[in-house]
Amino acid sequence: VSWSRGLGDVYKRQLSIDIDYRTRSLKEEKNFFLSNSPVSKLKINDIFSIHSNKTSVEDKVISVKKRNFVVKNLSNRIARFQFNEICGDNRGTEDYLELIKLIDRLIIENVPNFGNTNSNLQERFINLIDILYDNKIKLYLSTEKEISDLGSAYPVSYTHLRAHETN
């Protein structure tokens, strides 16, 4: 692949094999849930409880460029956020890089169906997913729709794969 071509060209071609080896580990532990399901909410609560090892939950304040970023629900290197708390404010790469120093696992709840009206949220979400992927942080999401069905103002099919690969 020539880097002089746009990245969009890289993701247009489909794999011509029967097994997508990048998603094999998805069967081992579920990490995507639908927001409107009561069962999903219970499972996310269980994930947080198990991985926090029932240690005390705290809020931690990170200061980045004279801005405060509150990491709510932090316990035993797992953090839990509502989507708007982590992507809704003016967050950037520096915020997310500071966050990953504190965690090995991240739960993001209530990820909306993206459309053409919230492109800033989508950019922050894509940036966060890339940082989590690059740093091997395990991700759990609850979304309005299946992650592959989330609408987008951008061609973000590779983001779906990266989100799956954060296992």
Whereabouts are the PLM-identified features?
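Interdomain motor-coupling "hinge/lid" segment immediately C-terminal to the ATP-binding subdomain
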Residues: 9-66
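Short glycine-/polar-rich loops that comprise or flank the Walker A/P-loop
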Residues: 12-13, 103-104, 135-137
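Hydrophobic/aromatic beta-strand patches that form the interior of the parallel beta-sheet core
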Residues: 13-17, 81, 140
